[in-house]
């Protein structure tokens, strides 16, 4: 069943789940005008911190960083090959006159303030940039983060399951990436697919199996949240990870983006 969350009350009712949903209206207290996608692609492919994959494996994740295969290629040549790019932290390109100038002030701070105002805390919250070339896919996998996915431009199809627990029990979801392989013989009616276009937002739950097709060139932002808690409580799936490991796995992962740091800066 497709779901769209439009109010904060609905978000609070649905954030602790394993079935993805779209987000609109009051849940998104920000907007931003990004540079043309061509400019973003040309800049990111030249950045040393950018990683890349071919985007050809659908049933499992690409495991190898192939960015060096794409460096030096023209935009036109990139459009003729199979590529996806990932830049790890948008704020590193947020300086006066830079590619994402103003992003922190206009997007990241309002989003963090919204979470804080409604009882959330977190161990990490940062934004990364993604570009998918035409006719590519982000392979089947499960993230160790709660992710707000902002599809800024282009068309994607975000696939998951209507009943993730049936196909991928939590014990299996916490296995390493190499073991995350799409189940066989999944009936079409068990697949939950969202067609997403320009300026569309989707909440992708931690440990939710998913895979994403990009029929055309797309650019988007992922807000990654680790240790996300509402009124002090983790979502049940992240609590499972903590219990399994016996410790908090987020402590050393971007600690400068933790809510205690953000709250101090927003006073």
Regions found by a protein language model. Give the residues of each.
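Short, compositionally biased
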Residues: 173, 215-225
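Fe(II)/2-oxoglutarate
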Residues: 1-36, 43
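Short histidine-centered beta-strand/loop micro-motifs
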Residues: 33, 138-143, 148-150, 159, ...
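Catalytic micro-motifs at enzyme active sites that drive phosphoryl/nucleotidyl and oxygen chemistry
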Residues: 10, 115-117, 136-141
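Conserved double-stranded beta-helix
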Residues: 192-196, 200, 223, 227-267
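Conserved short histidine dyad/triad with adjacent acidic residue
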Residues: 128-142, 160-165
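Double-stranded beta-helix
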Residues: 151-210, 227, 238
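Signature of the catalytic double-stranded beta-helix
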Residues: 27, 36-125
């Amino acid at each position: 069943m497709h779901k769209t969350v439009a109010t904060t009350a609905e978000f609070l009712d649905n954030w602790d789940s394993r079935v993805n949903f779209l987000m609109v209206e009051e849940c998104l207290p920000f907007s931003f005008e990004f540079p043309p996608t061509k400019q973003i692609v040309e800049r990111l492919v030249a950045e040393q911190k950018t990683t890349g994959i071919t985007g050809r494996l659908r049933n499992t994740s690409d495991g190898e960083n192939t960015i060096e295969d794409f460096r030096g290629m023209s935009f036109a040549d990139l459009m003729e090959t199979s590529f996806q790019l990932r830049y790890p932290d948008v704020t590193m390109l947020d300086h006066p006159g830079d590619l994402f100038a103003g992003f922190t002030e206009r997007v990241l701070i309002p989003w963090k303030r919204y979470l804080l105002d409604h009882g959330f805390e977190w161990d990490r919250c940062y934004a990364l940039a993604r570009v998918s070339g035409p006719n590519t896919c982000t392979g089947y996998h499960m993230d160790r983060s709660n992710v707000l996915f902002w599809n800024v431009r282009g068309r994607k199809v975000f696939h998951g399951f209507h009943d993730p627990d049936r196909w991928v029990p939590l014990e299996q979801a916490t296995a390493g990436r190499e073991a995350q392989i799409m189940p066989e013989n999944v009936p079409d009616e068990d697949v939950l697919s969202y067609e997403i276009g320009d300026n569309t937002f989707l909440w992708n739950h931690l440990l939710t199996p998913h895979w994403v097709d990009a029929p055309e060139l797309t650019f988007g932002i992922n807000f990654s949240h680790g240790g996300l808690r509402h009124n002090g409580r983790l979502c049940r799936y992240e609590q499972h990870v903590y219990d399994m490991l016996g410790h908090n796995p987020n402590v050393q992962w971007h600690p400068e983006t933790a809510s205690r740091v953000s709250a101090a800066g927003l006073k």
